[in-house]
């Protein structure tokens, strides 16, 4: 099995320690490193008098990890001394002695890393902990308890504070990582590792800034697609550009992460993420021994929170009423004023959990000297962890309630101190589920839109730049929009009675262009505006409109279906424009009005950057954008051996239904050869995984033909007849491919052309090899791979499988 490139950091096999001060690892050596740790005195390292051999390191092998904690002025000499061992990773801890030039320290680490093929975490990292291994490679004096939540932070103080708090409430972690100054290993690379880490069920991230928006976007998307990712990001300054704030919020929403805004919410998130049961919706039932706590929780739910009060079924209300005293509240919130008993708590929980209109239960308890709260908490400790729906508790108070909260914490169910934090924690769980539901939604198929005249648009912009023109005239702006078939016309005046809208584009220095839709003739990013990052498809464009306050208050009633479709198309095509023409600094269509069903603009301004377009964005991977757009330039018409035409193109989210039809249409043998199982159709998760592609790190291609559609009077429809994709391997250097061709289209030359395109794309992404597992009985596939230059090896773990692989360096040569 391939080893992840960060495995040497999180699961090192050999370790060298160079430190001028005591570290926790000196007192407790992890079991996996028994007889494999070498302590090198700092004077020896600085003088390059390091030992020839290290403990547990065979001759000729690389050292996995070096832990360095020395004054910044000594770090370069220590790194040079470590070259002898060719370390895979160096962890540079923060040192009490300040640096004269922190920026130069980081630059030196990057240069040394590049010259020596070695990754560096730091400088000025707080360190790394892997509690299940007993490994504490940090400054924190105590190792965290083992758990299933990973903590990643860019702040040493935040890491220390969270570890101290977690020890007090007996919360554990799968990993704790403080990245420091991100010399080489950054947050994105850590997220990549944690997304595949079997010990990690969820990730809590404290973020101050992102050094590479594209890498962060890609890694966050990969992580959030398989486990909850909670992000606390501080604003970099009190006067931070609101465009960046809105763009970053849009980015997190796009990748499926959940953003929190306050430090106290980080504690709530970490605590609630240990809950193995996740809500399937947003409807919450409240159970309280007094109405004060319930009112506080409802206040939180009523201020734009992710969750809301569930409507109980009539049978549930009747059942609850039979268990409560006269005068109690049986409809949500369920409130009892009599002393609670264990039997009553168990009965109430059973009813609320069984209600189909309830997705989770929030139990709020205040101290009650007349009640046996210990027995009540014992019921919660027994019922909540085993419940099929999440049960979150809030035990208000400290003197008598702290010990009871610890009982629930030890039982593995989160117990909070205030109604606000408990309700917010539920919102975090529900928010993640909601984002994943959206991510797996099957979009209806849509035809590829009419291709734009990109060359003409770029020539228009370049001509203006050569003239020193930074702002296009309205007529030039309209011509630019016309190159991308944006359905908007110019008008002199606002039509009477028309709604006044605005479409705006601004360029964020880190995240690239962001789009806004809302009320016209207002400052950018008014409260009623919604923001999204391009590229947009039809679904995202509709969501952008419908998320705006202007739609909810006015447009939903005044916009006709035809006009709404024109608006959707305009947004989608403007997003394509700013993707393909990076020189656009800003774009304002304000006011945007309606003349009948036609979109007309009485104000149009396009500002250009001063940098000329010498390099086409498709050759740089659209580096000016946080999200890689659909690589339309890869779409090509091809021919089969007999001359029949077919289209080779990258897959889109809208291909989910056609791809499902393709898989259903495969023969049992073809499905088994591809999936090594007898599945008859793809699961929703598999469909989303194969069609919602991160073009920055992977690629999926389809072969399609046009055929008459009997449902629509024989009008042509696109049909998928072949599918190929590759996903990056854990080592970050190669990718695993998969290929399947429809039965009636095999031996037509389609498979070889799809594979050649995959190989070219993998080379452009600087991968060094591409491989895959093929059933030994699949002789046609083995023959094709051999024909394409792949080598065939037996699989060590399964004799029925073959590993086929291609060295892309050799192919390039």
Q: Which residues does each PLM region occupy?
A:
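Long, contiguous binding/interaction regions
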Residues: 610-813
